[in-house]
Swiss-Prot record:
Residues modified as Phosphotyrosine: Y223
GO molecular function annotations of the record: heme binding; iron ion binding; monooxygenase activity; oxidoreductase activity, acting on paired donors, with incorporation or reduction of molecular oxygen
Source organism per UniProt: Drosophila melanogaster (Fruit fly)
Coiled-coil regions listed: none
Family (UniProt): Belongs to the cytochrome P450 family.
Entry GO CC: endoplasmic reticulum membrane
Gene it is expressed from: Cyp313a5
Record-given protein name: Probable cytochrome P450 313a5
Annotated Pfam families: p450
Function, as annotated: May be involved in the metabolism of insect hormones and in the breakdown of synthetic insecticides.
Necessary cofactors: heme
Membrane topology, record value: Peripheral membrane protein
Annotated binding of heme, by residue: C433
Main location: endoplasmic reticulum
Enzyme class: oxidoreductase
Length: 487
């Protein structure tokens, strides 16, 4: 009996200590609007019940306003789509790190890289990698981009007048080929698991496992992960991707042949040779780059094609511009100077990234307390959800028709009139995506060749699009497109 009483007293003391140590969170909860959700799990169950649909945050913002405090598990989460609050977050040195839960989920699948490094380690790594993404380096990849875009032109010829199709699987293959070749060099084309598609399947598996590891972090426990087969799937996919990268690195380090096309690996391995980076550093970095680049590019191009099919007036406007710059059509070569002339295509691309951003959500964590411009005090240890999707549809910024497709939103005069943190397709501040310029050039070049040669249509309505959170944006139902050849 005495033992039981001692145990109960000890449990009460622990509980009181736990609550007292988190008092700053509960004080914040009294000042900021938002739901608590269920005990211990917060809104995690509701998020899973809705199958990760973005609609949950739409409901929260409608009820509680543009900045909401809620809970996932025992973690307080501040969700916002207010540009001024986003500016506070992006410009604060105390909000530069991702949530530790997200970092662990990513690094367990991809290894350590710019996606997960923190503070000084991140600063040093970015400084080392930045020259590889400068303008001249990016433009050196245009021949590779032209070749792979021509592959798309040839591929789509097979679908002409062949009924409605889902283009995303083919675009996934195309974007993965670009990411792998630009990162690892043209030698990847000789790799068996690259040719047979197994490598792409491995990265797709990792893309699905990362958000599961974020929402259900207990699955990263070795024993629980095995029990629910999470660990088996993670290990299989990570092993295959790592083996591919290791094989290419080893061949590059032992080779004296410099005749291949330029690739990031050649520049970055020079940092290994002079001792600036370790072998493990580049293993993780290459995995991070391939993962981040391939999925976002295919999603963006696919979404542009979908919206062009839904809005034929804008598709015709873009075609007229393309026909003027590229009179011949077919498998033409496009230079960077050519792409700079495509202002209508550029507006369509940016409007698509506004309405359907490839990355709908960024997650940070306060390393020290900060005070927001609205006067609210956010203590250390709070998870910050930067809701890009709803920021891009914020009616206070984009007007009453914020949800409508309108490329004129990106006319020069309209861009100048908006707050700087209202459009975030590649993040913002010092953690802006390193490859943003390469991504835009890749997308514009592929879109130019597709839309110059083909006309797309669909019976799927814009209002019926439904969006799902993932590492990258997913559509609940993929619209099917019909392809016709342009004369």
């Amino acid at each position: 009996m005495l033992t039981l009483q001692i145990f109960e007293a000890f449990a009460i003391i622990l509980c009181v200590y736990f609550l007292w140590s988190r008092r700053r969170f509960y004080i914040m909860m009294l000042k900021l609007p938002g739901p608590m959700g269920f005990p211990f799990i917060g809104l995690a169950f509701e998020y899973i019940r809705l199958k990760r649909k973005i609609r949950l945050r739409t409901i929260l913002f409608k009820i509680y306003g543009k900045t909401v405090l809620t809970w996932i598990g025992l973690t307080p989460v501040l969700v916002t789509c207010e540009p001024k609050i986003l500016e506070d977050i992006f410009t604060s040195p105390n909000c530069s790190n991702r949530s530790s839960v997200v970092d662990k989920a990513i690094s367990s699948c991809l290894g350590l890289g710019l996606l997960t490094l923190k503070n000084n380690h991140w600063n040093e790594r970015r400084k080392l990698l930045l020259p590889s993404f400068k303008n001249n380096a990016v433009l050196s990849f245009v021949p590779v981009l032209n070749n792979e875009a021509n592959f798309l032109v040839t591929l789509l010829a097979e679908f002409v007048d062949g009924g409605d199709i889902n283009l995303l699987p083919e675009l996934n293959k195309w974007s993965f080929k670009i990411a792998a070749q630009i990162t690892m060099g043209d030698e990847v084309r000789n790799q068996a698991n690259y040719q047979n598609g197994n490598l792409l399947e491995s990265y797709k598996a990792l893309n699905n496992l990362i958000p599961i590891g974020v929402v259900m972090p207990w699955l990263r426990n070795k024993y629980l992960g095995k029990l629910f087969s999470y660990e088996k799937r993670r290990l299989e996919a990570a092993t295959q991707s790592n083996a591919f990268i290791k094989d290419i690195i080893d061949k590059k380090l032992s080779s004296t042949d410099n005749s291949s096309e330029p690739a990031l690996i050649d520049r970055i391995l020079n940092l290994v040779r002079i001792g600036e980076l370790s072998y493990d550093d580049v293993m993780g970095e290459f995995s991070n780059i391939i993962f981040a680049a391939s999925d976002t590019l295919s999603i963006t191009v696919n979404n542009v094609l979908i919206l062009m099919a839904m809005f034929p007036k804008y598709q015709d406007n873009v075609f007229e511009e393309l026909a003027e710059v590229f009179p011949s059509g077919g498998e033409f070569e496009a230079s960077h100077a050519d792409l700079e002339k495509l202002v209508k295509l550029d507006r369509v691309l940016h409007e698509t990234m506004r309405l359907i951003p490839a990355v709908p959500l960024l997650i940070r964590q306060t390393s020290h307390s900060i005070q927001l411009s609205n006067g609210f005090y956010i203590p250390e240890g709070v998870t910050l959800m930067i809701d890009i999707f709803h920021t891009h549809r914020n009616k206070d910024i984009w007007g009453p028709q914020a949800n409508a497709f309108n490329p004129d939103n990106f006319l020069p005069e309209n861009k100048r009139a908006r707050p700087p943190y209202s459009y975030l397709p590649f993040s913002k501040g010092k953690k802006t995506c390193l490859g943003w310029k390469l991504s835009l050039i890749s997308a514009k070049l592929a879109l130019a060749k597709i839309l110059r040669n083909y006309m797309l249509s669909t019976t799927f309505l814009y209002k019926d699009l439904r969006f799902i959170d993932n590492t990258t944006m997913k559509l609940a139902e993929q619209p099917l497109l019909a392809v016709k050849r342009r004369i």
